[in-house]
């Protein structure tokens, strides 16, 4: 009897010692795997960022090269110098491009609608960064045709679309999670901007300030920096290390000039407001008064009017960088500068609302340059000052760029990088910030946030978290999860995990208090790493993770899911530590769309009531 008792005690002690050794071995194995996985994760992150920088940069370079080729072929001055053509041909060149892009829009209306920077932001906010590759291809060729045949728009919007599309395609191809897709989509957009403008710092801040709407994460920043640097190196190698603008010597004046810079900053904000007012007026004209819905009916009449003015002044053609360079070497009188300033504002608004393909960065730079230049000439003529028009033209570029596009930081860095001159950084900062504040004050939001609201997308920079911030966890709690006690044997755990309804097992003690989660991966790893895995019990494998309370918002659960890469989050009563249920990723998605649908329905009903 005593012998049998001693044997049982011995076996029990051996079992406890073995289980403790297994648990320690398993713990060491998990730590080792964690370190190895973290190293692999960071190396993969760097490698993917480099690949996206190379491909997005190559896409931007190819786009830039084809655009320059098309623009040079169809530029009126080049046509007249190479062949003796009738001026009527020049008149119809913009309409030819409009005819082709309108037909493309007619064939693919849904794809054509997702254009420019705004579509990349929307993809990140509501599609988890996913951009179909056919969209990328469409918006590669359409802007080349549109801008190359004279549309006074810029290459940066299409470039961001191309780079973002490449980043999205690569990360989708690699089957990365949604957070990584968002990160690499923004990195691709920033890399393309970096390549097109030879401005890596501006490319990084463009990704942060515009595409991510200032929602910055550390890994997102590193991806943006790596991709932008790689893209810029590639662009400098392929296109040469040259600046977009050739800036002659200029004089900033003394500190008394800062009062005039301040006045110019306010004028830049007013000019930006004028652009938005005109843009809204033209939009109402097309939609409400004329009720033109076809792309042909909107764009071709605009290009015919543009063609008439183009016969009068070739400086209206295309992107306008050469015109800015000519402005800075004093090729324009005051009246010529004012005339081009007014026409560029009007045609930018017209082409955008008519459905042409291109961005607003380059036209903003051109409008700002003419605004600052004209301001200086007017001040010298009527107030007997002696300020330098070139200096004020440079400062005006930053002011209007920041005002029209709501990007104060990016505008400062972009103008600084494309000019390569540090001297005017202080007045540039002043004009960018003040112009931006004028817009925010009078419009109540940035250009992109207002555009999103116009499309009934009331999702701010935090995406689905903001929408669900007022929805409690208790509204989607599940109580039919698989639960095991702490002392449950390993063999029972295997059978339970195989048939687990939500893929995880939740471990509790005898008082029903939550101890941790066991995943299929944990069980599989225990089998691989240990010959004596059968001696393990549930508490040995349970991983203690943060939980939410029933009254917490669903956004809290989302944060935990993102941080720990979970599909399910336990719901625990903090007062007694008891497990009350779980929240699943699928239920969160369903709740999100339910709330969005309810908001859309409410807005529709309100609009209907107001219409009555």
What is the role of each PLM region?
Residues 456, 469-481, 488, 522, ...:
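Bateman (tandem CBS) regulatory domains
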Residues 1-470, 474-475, 479-480, 484-493, ...:
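Alpha-helical transmembrane segments and immediately membrane-proximal extracytoplasmic
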Residues 205, 413, 515-523, 580-589:
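Short hydrophobic beta-strand motif reused across regulatory alpha/beta modules
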Residues 484-501, 508, 527-530, 534, ...:
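The conserved cystathionine-beta-synthase
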